């Protein structure tokens, strides 16, 4: 493993034996890396991390390079635990046949310091749906909180047993010609996806690690158990009526308990509800303003407005009813228009 940008980190995993065309390393690597962002766009610059796979020869005295996979850690910033499957690229594609192997990597990133506001570069990965595939290559990502890189080891073969995401692992599998035809060909998933693989860079937010909601459901929690309702026959009519009344009262009490029983909402629905509660409803504000206004017709307001006055020679002027008193009596006469 080698960090090409944003720092200097090199590491080697332990040597493992190939079993059933698969290799499981189950190793975890942690290191710090520095990412810069464009001042104009805020998009993170590429931060390449290379994982190369080698095969020992001559009893460990020599080795052959099977291939490598370059991971742009900037694509995973802020995505929490992300799993990526990569097809190994060959070093010498002209003279050497490329190895048919898939590397599975789990990436977890944590923001240690710096500005938490940034944009991830567009993903260069591809998502290939497979019919009958039980494990989705494009699952909801998990949020995290910090910027440290953890590297682990996972299984990359279609036939081998699956490794849980918590056991971050690097894996590399070699498939035969028949197995390669039957293998689960998986491309790169998006930077927001979470497959099962090996290193992880997270800029964790509020989402809890491991919470993957698939829908909104309301689950009714168990309420307090109600007492069994029994009505024993009684020869006395008064006692029978009392028993029936008690039974009805218990039924009403049980229904009230069920009504008061709290309903546990899914995390997504509860988060949306909390966000809506903090927002001001514009319709309510407009309704309050309309209710506070008086739109009734006031006749007295019309009489106190401007009036038309006509003076000698046909001159006109506008003013209130105090205008004749100011300009002198007889100078202007009020014009009255009857409706």
UniProtKB/Swiss-Prot annotation:
Organism: Mus musculus (Mouse)
Swiss-Prot/TrEMBL keywords: Phosphoprotein
Pfam families listed in its UniProt record: NT-C2
Family note: Belongs to the EEIG family.
Region described as Disordered: spans on this chain: 226-262
Protein's name according to its UniProt entry: EEIG family member 2
Entry-linked PROSITE patterns: C2_NT (PS51840)
Organism ancestry: Eukaryota, Metazoa, Chordata, Craniata, Vertebrata
Biased amino acid composition, Basic and acidic residues: 249-259
Annotated positions of the Phosphoserine modification: 197, 255, 267, 299-300, 329
Tissue expression pattern: Expressed in bone marrow-derived macrophages.
Domain of life: Eukaryota
Gene that this sequence comes from: Eeig2
Segments forming domain C2 NT-type: 1-111
Alphabetical list of PANTHER family matching this protein: EEIG FAMILY MEMBER 2, FAMILY WITH SEQUENCE SIMILARITY 102
Compositional bias ranges of the Low complexity kind: 230-248
């Amino acid at each position: 493993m080698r960090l090409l940008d944003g720092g200097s980190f090199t590491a080697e995993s332990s040597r493992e034996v190939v079993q059933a065309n698969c290799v499981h390393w189950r190793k975890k690597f942690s290191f710090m890396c520095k990412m810069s962002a464009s001042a104009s766009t805020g998009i993170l610059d590429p931060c390449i991390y290379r994982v190369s796979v080698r095969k020992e020869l001559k009893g460990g005295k020599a080795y052959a390079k099977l291939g490598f996979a370059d991971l742009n850690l900037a694509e995973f910033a802020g995505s929490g635990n992300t799993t990526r499957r990569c097809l190994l690229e060959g070093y010498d594609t002209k003279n050497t046949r490329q190895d048919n192997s898939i590397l599975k990597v789990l990436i977890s990133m944590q923001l240690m310091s710096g500005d938490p506001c940034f944009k991830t570069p567009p993903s260069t990965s591809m998502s290939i749906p497979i019919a009958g595939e039980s494990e989705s290559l494009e699952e909801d990502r998990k949020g995290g909180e910090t910027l440290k890189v953890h590297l682990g080891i996972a299984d990359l073969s279609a036939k081998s047993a699956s490794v849980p995401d918590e056991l971050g692992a690097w894996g590399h599998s070699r498939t035969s010609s028949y197995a390669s035809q039957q293998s689960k060909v998986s491309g790169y998933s998006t930077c927001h996806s979470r497959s099962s693989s090996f290193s992880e860079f997270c800029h964790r937010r509020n989402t809890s690690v491991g919470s993957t909601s698939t829908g909104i459901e309301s689950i009714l929690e168990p309420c307090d158990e109600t007492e069994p309702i029994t009505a024993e026959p009684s020869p006395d009519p008064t006692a029978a009526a009392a028993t029936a009344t008690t039974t009805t009262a218990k039924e009403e009490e049980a229904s009230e308990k069920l009504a008061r029983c709290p309903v546990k909402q899914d995390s997504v629905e509860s988060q949306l509800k909390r966000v809506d509660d903090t927002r001001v409803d514009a319709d309510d504000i407009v309704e309050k303003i309309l209710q506070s206004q008086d739109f009734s017709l006031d006749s007295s307001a019309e009489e106190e407005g401007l009036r038309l006055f006509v003076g000698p020679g046909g001159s006109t002027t506008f003013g209130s009813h105090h205008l004749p008193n100011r300009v002198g009596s007889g100078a202007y006469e009020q014009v009255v228009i009857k409706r």
